[in-house]
Amino acid sequence: MRTSNYLLSTLKETPNDAEVVSHQLMLRAGMIRKLASGLYTWLPTGLRVLRKVENIVRQEIDNAGAVETLMPVVQPFELWEETGRSEKMGPELLRFTDRHTRPFVLSPTAEEVITSLVRNEVSSYKQLPLNLYQIQTKFRDERRPRFGVMRAREFCMMDAYSFDIDKEGLEKSYQAMHDAYCKAFDRMGLEYRPVLADSGAIGGSGSQEFHVLAESGEDLIAFSTESDYAANIEKAEAAAPAGERAEPTQEMTLVDTPNAKTIAELVEQHGLAIEKTVKTLFVKASDEVDADIIALIVRGDHELNEVKAENLPQVASPLEMATEEEMRALIGAGAGSLGPVGLELPFIVDRSVAVMSDFGAGANIDDKHYFGINWGRDVELGQVEDLRNVVEGDPSPCGQGTLMLKRGIEVGHIFQLGNVYSEAMNCGVLGPDGKNVILEMGCYGIGVSRVVASAIEQNHDKYGIIWPDALAPFQVAIVPMNMHKSEEVKEAAEKLYAELTAMGIEVLFDDRKERPGVMFSDMELIGIPHTIVIGDRSMKEGNFEYKNRRSGEKTAVAMADIVEHVKAQLQ
C-alpha cells in the first residue's frame, strides 16, 4: 500500500478528551474518529488491525469446532420478555419501535436470538453438540461512554453459544472454548490471565474472564504466586482464616467517641489497631428476610465486596445501602456508630471478623463505641460468610502461595449457562429415550474492538504504538528519503516494494513528498514493527537501514540481503 493512495490521518497533538493511552494513540495514529458519544468510525489503519484480531479469533474458534453464523443487530423485544431480561438489562438495552409500533431492541448480546434459532432448527440429540458463533456489531447504551473503543456504545464482538445434551457435554464445550481463547491471545502476543468471575446479568454458574494485564485496566485481578489460581476482585477469595479464635483478655466497655465518625478517626484517636475494629454496613434486605434492612460486618481494614454481598439470598439485588434516615428510624443512630452488640436486626459476619476477639465496634448510640467485644460472651456470632475483597498478601484459597493484585482489561468472558435460557425459552430436543431434554448452554464472548485498545495499552512507548507482529496494520514500512529528488532512491524503493509485496508481505510504502522526520514519526506512531530506510548516503555504501520498532535497534543491511533479512525478522 502506498501512502499516496491511503488515508494516513495522523495527528501531532493529543486530543483533550482522550483519557487513556490507547484512546490517545488510536486517535493520533488515525485508527478511529469519534462520530458521537461512544460511536467511532474505524479508519483504514484501525480497520486493518481490527480485521487481524477478527481473523485470529475466527481461526481458533473454528478450530474448536464452532460454526460461524450471522444474526441481526435488531432483535424483537418479545424474545427478551421470554427470558425476563427485558427489565434486568435496564437502560443499557436500547429499545425502539418500528413504523408499525412493534417493539425491538438493538442487540447487546444474542442469547435469546440463538436459543430461538436452535429450538426451531434442532430437534434431536443426534444433532448435538452444536456451537454457533458470529462476529458482529453490538450496542449497549452506556451511561458514560469513555476510554475510546474500550467502553464504547457500539462495538465489535465475537459471541458464541454451545448446546449440549448434558452437563458433561457442556463442560467439554466450555473447556474447548477456554483453550481456543488461550491460543488466540497467545497468537496475538498479549500478556493475559484467565480468571474466575461472577456470571452477572448473563446468568448461569461457572464463568471465567480473560484479562489483558495493563496498569490502566478498570478491573483488579488476584492471582496466586505459586499456582494457576486467578480470579477477578469480585470473585476472588482468600483462604479461610486458620486457627481458633483467641480467648478474651478484655472486658467490654462503652467508650465516648464524639469525634470518631470513621474507622480511621477511631484508630487515630483511641489507639486501636485497625485490624481490631469492625465496620457495620446496613443494606436493603431481600424478600427472604423478615426485615427491610440487614447488617453486613467486615473488619475495619477490609472493604465489602458488593458482588459477594449481592449474591447472598438475604440481600436485595442490586445492592442498596440504607440511608441515614433509615438507620436512625431503626436504631436511633447513624453511620459511624453501628455495631453488632444489641443490634435487633439480622446480620451476617465476614469470615475474618468471626475469628476476632477483643475488638471494637459502634454501640448503636451516636458518638459511642464498645471496645473489648467478644463473640459468644457479648453477642452471638450468627451467620458467617465471605464478604470482603481480598488484599495483596492474603493466603491463596488453593493453599499454594499468596495473592498478588494487578490491573487488567477484560477482553473475553466464557460462561456455563446451564439451562437458564433454554428452560425459559423451552429449547429442548428428543433424547435417546424419546423424551424431551432441555439443552445445556454455554456462551462465550470476545470484545474484538476492545482487544485492539488493550494491545495498545500493553504495547506502546513515548513515540507511539508498538504492535505485536500478529496485529500490526502493516508488517513492513519502506521510508525512502527525498525520493522525489533522487532517482536512485526512487528506483530502489520501488524495486523493494515490488519484491516484498510479491511475497505476500504487507508493506506500507511512504511515497509522500514529506520531510524524513515526519515520515519516521508517522511510522513509529502507527507502530509498524519493521522499517527499511532507503537513502543516498547508505546506498553509496551498498546498504539499506533496517529498524526494529520494539527494540529501537538500527542495522545496516546489504541491499542484496535486505529481502532475506526481512523474511528472517518476520518468522
Curated annotation (Swiss-Prot):
A GO molecular-function descriptor: aminoacyl-tRNA deacylase activity
Name of the featured protein: Proline--tRNA ligase
Lineage top rank: taxon: Bacteria
One Gene Ontology CC term in the entry: cytosol
Database matches in InterPro entries: aa-tRNA-synt_IIb, aa-tRNA-synth_II, aa-tRNA-synth_II/BPL/LPL, Anticodon-bd, Anticodon-bd_dom_sf, Pro-tRNA-ligase_IIa, Pro-tRNA-synth_IIa_bac-type, Pro-tRNA-Synthase_IIa_type1
Reactions this protein catalyses: tRNA(Pro) + L-proline + ATP = L-prolyl-tRNA(Pro) + AMP + diphosphate
UniProt-listed GO biological process terms: prolyl-tRNA aminoacylation
Domain writeup: Consists of three domains: the N-terminal catalytic domain, the editing domain and the C-terminal anticodon-binding domain.
Coiled coil: none
Keyword ATP-binding: yes
Top-level EC class as recorded in UniProt: ligase
UniProt function note: Catalyzes the attachment of proline to tRNA(Pro) in a two-step reaction: proline is first activated by ATP to form Pro-AMP and then transferred to the acceptor end of tRNA(Pro). As ProRS can inadvertently accommodate and process non-cognate amino acids such as alanine and cysteine, to avoid such errors it has two additional distinct editing activities against alanine. One activity is designated as 'pretransfer' editing and involves the tRNA(Pro)-independent hydrolysis of activated Ala-AMP.
